[in-house]
């Protein structure tokens, strides 16, 4: 690298980091002041760091994205604010997740969140995550938050492979699959604890043809030794979590 090129690269880095920080700060402020956003969501932001997480994934205005296994839609609303009025968010939940007592609660939470058309750029997608029914190459990004481990809690050993194949189909070239999950230890039976092993996620992604574009320690918590279920009162909400940015070639 020539001296001029090196100097330009250094200057660019000086501008890039503040801009990223500004983007995250702006989204944080927007989420805090969002009218009608649940108070519990706003309280959770400090520990979940959604603005910084989406900044790491590179998700921004005008993008078309999907919130996978969205449940009541915490990240759906975060994404809706991040992509803005010129973007679009699909809120995906499997039909089976919207039945029974728990499903009824989820459905009510969704209806409350979307009431009055307050998230006009959000469209519900009640389909299985391995069969989204969206056009090929139609998404800029997909986010699966604290749910990737569910791909392993399934009798079908091909569940993860089918999911990743669908992600490759619907993402544009260069599109991002962002994964956030509770970290598990190698050798543990992580399924019952609702955890996932980072190396296992990375191996599955590589086998499916994704590029690992980076990992983040933003949500790491060394005080969690990963031996307890994520619902244990001593660590609920503050588990050790990994963040992975996967990219479709």
What are these regions (language model features)?
Residues 129, 140-158:
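A short SAM/SAH-binding and catalytic strip from SAM-dependent methyltransferases
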Residues 63, 132-143:
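A short acidic, Gly/Pro-enriched loop at the edge of an enzyme's catalytic core
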Residues 62-71:
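Conserved class I S-adenosyl-L-methionine
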Residues 80-81, 158-173:
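A short glycine-rich, Lys/Arg-flanked "PGG" loop and its adjoining helix->strand segment in the class I
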Residues 27-56, 60:
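Class I SAM-dependent methyltransferase Rossmann-like catalytic core
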Residues 208, 223-249:
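Core SAM-dependent methyltransferase catalytic element
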Residues 174-183:
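Conserved beta-strand signature within the Rossmann-like core of class I S-adenosyl-L-methionine
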Residues 101-131:
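S-adenosyl-L-methionine
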